């Protein structure tokens, strides 16, 4: 992907009557076009967040939401578009029980290099246990961020309050790990 591009996503089955634009599309200023195919899985399907990032040196579009496939690729709730094809992120994010979903993503550097931070409702990454409802993707693999949160993480924001940039989480949780 090069230059500025506008992508839209959401809870829709078609756009202007075109079902190929299911849940995600690209706008060129005149018309909408397909972004590598549609999403699939158990209903309801939705793409809840898009993030364009070059944190690993490549211009990539990350999609997060509630889906099992995107563009014919198995991708549990999170995927990356390189301008040509979708790819899963090492098996994606899921839950041991109930439905999983990615609600928000942001790019941030915690001092070990820029990475993708993901919040939502999940406790497995690539089928392995991970911090509840928050995870870090370094471009190769998932890692935990402490023990996580007791409920959904709706938003992640990097902010410098004057003492250095930090990552803040907002959501419907009341506990961070074992702390209220």
Identify the function of each model-found stretch.
Residues 1-180:
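Extracytoplasmic surface signature
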């Amino acid at each position: 992907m090069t230059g500025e591009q506008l992508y839209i996503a959401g809870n829709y089955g078609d756009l202007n009557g075109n079902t190929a634009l299911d849940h995600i599309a690209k706008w060129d200023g005149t018309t909408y076009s397909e972004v590598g195919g549609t999403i699939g899985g158990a209903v309801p399907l939705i793409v809840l967040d898009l993030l364009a990032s070059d944190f690993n040196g490549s211009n990539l579009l990350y999609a997060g939401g509630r889906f099992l496939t995107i563009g014919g690729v198995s991708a549990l709730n999170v995927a990356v578009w390189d301008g040509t094809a979708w790819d899963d992120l090492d098996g994606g994010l899921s839950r041991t029980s109930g439905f999983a979903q990615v609600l928000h993503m942001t790019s941030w550097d915690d001092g070990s290099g820029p990475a993708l931070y993901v919040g939502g409702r999940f406790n497995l990454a690539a089928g392995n246990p991970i911090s509840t409802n928050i995870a870090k993707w370094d471009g190769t693999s998932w890692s935990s961020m402490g023990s996580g949160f007791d409920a959904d993480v709706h938003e992640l924001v990097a902010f410098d309050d004057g003492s250095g940039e930090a990552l803040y989480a907002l959501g419907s949780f009341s506990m961070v790990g074992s702390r209220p």
